[in-house]
């Protein structure tokens, strides 16, 4: 019940952030800057998804060089949870996705996150089902220890995938005893 309430609350916030982008008219490629390209990609992913995705958080790892041992001994590094999204591949073969996910954070409290992700995709083998990706995600999260105040995030993404299954990951930078967390999940396309 509590998790559903948090997800609904943040879905509404993200929807309010995304909806204005959907109203932006398309302009010619010559007139586009990075922001218009970004908003057009978000809008197209919202309006014309090719796939629906299931996200399953797999691991969080706190960089041992950046934490006191007594802290890492107490932290949760098994972020069970679930997420859903929609995605598409563009004409260059790059991945675009919109997602919402909720998982157990380092303190074993629920953390919702939602946003847009993009990855430049390489297919280095003859088998086009195998792929590697590098990109970013821009979104909003909220944490119990910050009173669930919405926090914008801009993080790197990397992935390795085969067919409909992708192992996707990010690194949350930080200072000593804060941040410096590797977070990874499985993404299944339907």
UniProtKB/Swiss-Prot annotation:
Source superkingdom: Bacteria
Keywords: Acyltransferase, Cell outer membrane, Membrane, Signal, Transferase
GO molecular function: acyltransferase activity
Main location class: membrane
Compartment annotation: Cell outer membrane
Known catalytic reactions: a lipid A + a 1,2-diacyl-sn-glycero-3-phosphocholine = a hepta-acyl lipid A + a 2-acyl-sn-glycero-3-phosphocholine; a lipid IVA + a 1,2-diacyl-sn-glycero-3-phosphocholine = a lipid IVB + a 2-acyl-sn-glycero-3-phosphocholine; a lipid IIA + a 1,2-diacyl-sn-glycero-3-phosphocholine = a lipid IIB + a 2-acyl-sn-glycero-3-phosphocholine
Pfam families: PagP (PF07017)
Site (Role in lipopolysaccharide recognition): 71
Sites annotated Role in the phospholipid gating: 176
Active site residues of this protein: 62, 105, 106
Disulfide bond residue pairs: none
EC number: 2.3.1.251
Classification via InterPro entries: LipidA_acyl_PagP, OMP/PagP_b-brl
GO biological process, alphabetically ordered: lipid A biosynthetic process
First and last residue of the signal peptide: 1-29
CC terms in the record's Gene Ontology section: cell outer membrane
Family: Belongs to the lipid A palmitoyltransferase family.
Quaternary data: Homodimer.
Role: Transfers a fatty acid residue from the sn-1 position of a phospholipid to the N-linked hydroxyfatty acid chain on the proximal unit of lipid A or its precursors.
Protein's UniProt name: Lipid A acyltransferase PagP
Gene it is expressed from: pagP
């Amino acid at each position: 019940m509590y998790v559903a309430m948090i997800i609904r609350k943040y879905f509404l916030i993200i929807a309010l952030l995304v909806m204005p982008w959907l109203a932006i008219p398309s302009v010619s490629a010559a007139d586009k800057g990075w922001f218009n390209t970004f908003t057009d990609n978000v809008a197209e992913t919202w309006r014309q998804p090719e796939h629906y995705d299931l996200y399953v958080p797999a691991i969080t790892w706190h960089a041992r060089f950046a934490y006191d041992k007594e802290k890492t001994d107490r932290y949760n590094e098994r972020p069970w949870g679930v997420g859903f999204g929609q995605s598409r591949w563009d004409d260059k073969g790059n991945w675009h996705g919109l997602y919402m996910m909720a998982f157990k954070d380092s303190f074993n409290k629920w953390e919702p996150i939602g946003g847009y992700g993009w990855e430049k995709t390489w297919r280095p083998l003859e088998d086009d089902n195998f792929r590697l990706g590098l990109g970013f995600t821009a979104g909003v999260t909220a944490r119990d220890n910050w009173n669930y105040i919405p926090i914008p995030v801009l993080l790197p993404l990397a992935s390795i995938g085969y067919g409909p299954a992708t192992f996707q990951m990010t690194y949350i930078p930080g200072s000593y005893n804060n941040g410096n967390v590797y977070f990874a999940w499985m993404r299944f396309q339907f």
